[in-house]
Amino acid sequence: MAPWLRERMNRVCRALGVQRMLYGWRRADGAWLPHTRIHGATQVVASASLDIADHVYVGPFNLLDASGGLHIAEGVQVTSHCALLTHSSHHALRRAGRSYWGAANPPGFVRQPTHVGAYTFIGPHSVLAPGSRVGRGVLVRAFSYVSGDVPDHAIVAGQPARVIGDTRDIDGPWLAQHPECRADYENWTLAR
């Protein structure tokens, strides 16, 4: 199917709230990403500020808040019921009360870009706070709250999320059994 037709069908499906996986995404710079899949039940806020690579999977019932700049690298998987946030008003609203409404820049309002590195997995019901920088090859376990920096290849869990392991420890034995995958694995783990 032609990319323009796929894109038009995806827009109609999103507008109608169609509950299915939609294949292909047109980035704000015009690039067509044929292998990126974003479920129709996922809400994308400020898509013009979404910097997303190809080969990304975003499952159902997620919130991708790109209003402050959301960067999702190649091969990222976002499962379901996750929030990738780039702004937060909860402190500002609580502190300012009614004076929050209409204020140009209310105290406590946060807007920061969030980055998710290549081949990272984000488990169900996880939240990435505004300004988070999640490295490459990270495994974010279910129900985690991530804030701040997460190093490459970390396994993180909890609220707040803490490093509990390294994905290379579980990848090594598997790669020993599947040597045909080692070259591709090393290409993305070593690339910058």
What is the meaning of each model-derived region?
Residues 1-35, 75, 82, 88-94, ...:
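Terminal amphipathic alpha-helical/low-complexity segments used for targeting or macromolecular assembly
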Residues 148:
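Short helix N-cap motif at coil->helix boundaries in the Bergerat
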